[in-house]
């Protein structure tokens, strides 16, 4: 009996170590929309000034991985670990294989340029660590990823890919 407990503890420890070593943890689901990656650290010195700041350099890419279904982002919510959130309030359709960059700062949303601005001159993603969540209009988690700067960003450029 003791031998089984020791073996179970060793297996559990090995599993936890493997999970801790994974660069960006993903909560996989059957949803077509996935978080493709995050530019969590905007290039340059962080500044939240609306006209001269660099909040537009911070973005989250959402991609439609479906082979055939078009998805409307209206009602989807993006949030971080602290609960700061952005809700897509307008129609924004993603064709199969298409993506959108949800950028910080203010700008003009464009289906043609695949960009939606949060309309806020603050940063959403923490530079040291955070978790990005994408939830459906009904409140179910479509995708989520946790990252740490030291464990997930091997080249130190402030961008972490989640899905190819």
Language model features: what each stretch is:
Residues 65-67, 81-83, 105-107, 137:
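Solvent-exposed coil/turn segments that connect beta secondary-structure elements
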Residues 10-18:
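Bacterial N-terminal signal peptides
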Residues 78-90:
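Short beta-strand and strand-turn-strand segments in soluble, beta-rich domains
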Residues 76-79, 132-134:
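Short conserved beta-strand and strand-loop elements enriched in small hydrophobics
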Residues 2-10, 22-74, 123-126, 150-152, ...:
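A structural motif detector for short, solvent-exposed N-terminal "entry" segments of globular domains
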Residues 20-23, 158:
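Compositionally biased, intrinsically disordered/low-complexity regions enriched for serine, proline
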Residues 27-35, 45-47, 90-164:
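Solvent-exposed beta-edge/loop recognition patches
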């Amino acid at each position: 009996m003791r031998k089984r407990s020791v073996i179970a503890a060793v297996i559990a420890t090995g599993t936890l170590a493997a999970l801790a070593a994974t660069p960006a943890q993903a909560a996989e689901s059957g949803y077509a929309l996935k978080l493709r990656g995050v530019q969590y650290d905007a290039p340059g010195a962080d500044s939240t000034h609306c006209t001269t700041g660099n909040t537009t350099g911070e973005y989250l890419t959402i991609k439609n991985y479906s082979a055939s279904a078009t998805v409307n982002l209206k009602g989807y919510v993006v949030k971080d670990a602290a609960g700061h959130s952005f809700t897509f309030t307008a129609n924004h359709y993603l064709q199969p294989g298409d993506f959108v960059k949800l950028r910080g700062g203010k700008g003009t949303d464009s289906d043609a340029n695949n960009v939606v601005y949060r309309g806020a001159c603050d940063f959403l993603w923490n530079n040291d660590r955070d978790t990005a969540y994408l939830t459906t209009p009904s409140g179910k988690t479509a995708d989520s990823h946790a990252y740490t700067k030291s464990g997930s960003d091997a080249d130190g450029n402030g961008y972490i890919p989640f899905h190819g």
